[in-house]
């Protein structure tokens, strides 16, 4: 399949989900990705990955998940390479294709899963608000000037797979098995279930990865989240390196900032800076993406921060604690991975809450993290 055919395939999927005349912001998002990413050949990777994911389900009944950076792309989602819709939170109607944006929440897990549409049908909530621009540095590094020699094809494929981090998550497979055992599909579950939310925000991490559960127990002693949006922040900090210990933890303990002020992932950092560039400078020159990419790989920790960046951050009304936070950060994870992880923990906790017998029979202690 040619590059053009793959993008046409993604466009067709867009129309199937959002109708023949999608909301203009959805169209702009898709066209922006197509304009900037098409030349790097990422659509071919997305399509290949989607095929592997489908094959894993068809042949082995196992869910294969592409995590991290690939999940920031709307095209990847439309092609089936990612299950994370990166658009801002919104309700959409499968019947009339109406879209209603959620303006008052940063995390759709904090909103009820359904709403009644004007046409009388039930609207579903979707969208995790992840920018595609954070994928651009990866796309640029992927593009090769010369064809890959035949004798290096296997190595190239191995590196490609590593780059996209194709992984079978134990939690995803566990949710799939629980859906079969209970007859309740994960797609039918309200992700804002009151009892489940009470358990997770209250510190009940029995269905979580042991290492993450241990981190959250310690983090809850410093700051107790009141919403899934705040819990998502903590999960993002947990997957970073140098983002929590002797950094965000100390900032919160010393009252330098609130949890909501801290960019836990590279995507949040980019979006915050991009918005402030537009507000205070009336333009976005690439500064936000440059800072986010350097913070992502610990550039500022290793090399320090140049005067231009420091002066620009001050101009954008950022305080010293924010600059110190970036200087101490060694690696920033992706929002998509945190979103996916929290989603599966919510689903597992739901099954454990309402179907404890089936949960014990199917899962027990056999989740392979």
Role assignments for model-derived ranges:
Residues 15, 27-34, 213, 251, ...:
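A generic structural signal for ordered alpha-helices
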Residues 10-18:
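A charged N-terminal "starter" segment
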Residues 1-10, 52-56, 63-66, 70-367:
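Mg2+-dependent phosphoryl-transfer active-site scaffold
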Residues 20-65:
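Helix-rich "cap/lid" substructures immediately adjacent to catalytic or cofactor-binding pockets
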């Amino acid at each position: 399949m040619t590059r053009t055919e793959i993008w046409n395939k993604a466009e067709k999927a867009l129309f199937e989900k959002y109708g023949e005349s999608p909301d203009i912001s959805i169209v702009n998002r898709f066209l922006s990705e197509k304009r900037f990413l098409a030349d790097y050949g990422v659509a071919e990777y997305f399509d290949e990955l989607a095929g592997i994911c489908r094959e894993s389900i068809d042949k082995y009944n196992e869910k294969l998940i592409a995590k991290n950076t690939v999940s920031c792309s709307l095209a990847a989602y439309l092609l089936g390479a990612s299950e994370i819709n990166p658009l801002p939170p919104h309700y959409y109607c499968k019947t009339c294709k109406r879209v209603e944006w959620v303006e008052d929440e940063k995390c759709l897990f904090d909103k009820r899963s359904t709403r009644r549409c004007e046409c009388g049908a039930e609207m579903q909530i979707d969208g995790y608000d992840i920018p595609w621009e954070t994928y651009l540095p990866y796309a640029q590094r992927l593009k090769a000037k010369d064809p890959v020699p035949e004798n290096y094809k296997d190595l190239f494929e191995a590196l490609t797979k590593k780059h996209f981090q194709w992984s079978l998550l134990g939690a995803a497979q566990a949710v799939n098995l629980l859906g079969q055992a209970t007859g309740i599909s994960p797609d039918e579950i309200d992700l804002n279930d009151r009892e489940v939310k009470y358990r997770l925000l209250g510190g009940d991490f029995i269905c979580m990865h042991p290492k993450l559960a241990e981190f959250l127990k310690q983090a809850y002693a410093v700051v107790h989240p009141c919403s899934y949006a705040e819990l998502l922040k903590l999960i993002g900090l947990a997957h970073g390196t140098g983002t929590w210990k002797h950094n965000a933890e100390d900032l919160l303990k010393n009252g330098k900032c609130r949890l909501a002020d801290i960019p836990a992932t590279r995507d949040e950092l980019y979006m915050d800076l991009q918005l402030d560039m537009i507000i205070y400078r009336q333009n976005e020159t690439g500064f936000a993406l440059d800072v986010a990419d350097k913070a992502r790989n610990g550039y500022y920790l290793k090399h320090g921060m140049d005067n231009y960046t420091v002066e620009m951050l001050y101009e954008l009304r950022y305080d010293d604690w924010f600059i110190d936070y970036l200087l101490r950060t060694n690696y920033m994870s992706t929002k998509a991975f945190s979103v996916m992880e929290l989603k599966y923990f919510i689903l597992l906790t739901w099954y454990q809450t309402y179907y404890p017998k089936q949960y014990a029979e199917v899962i027990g202690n056999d989740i392979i993290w």
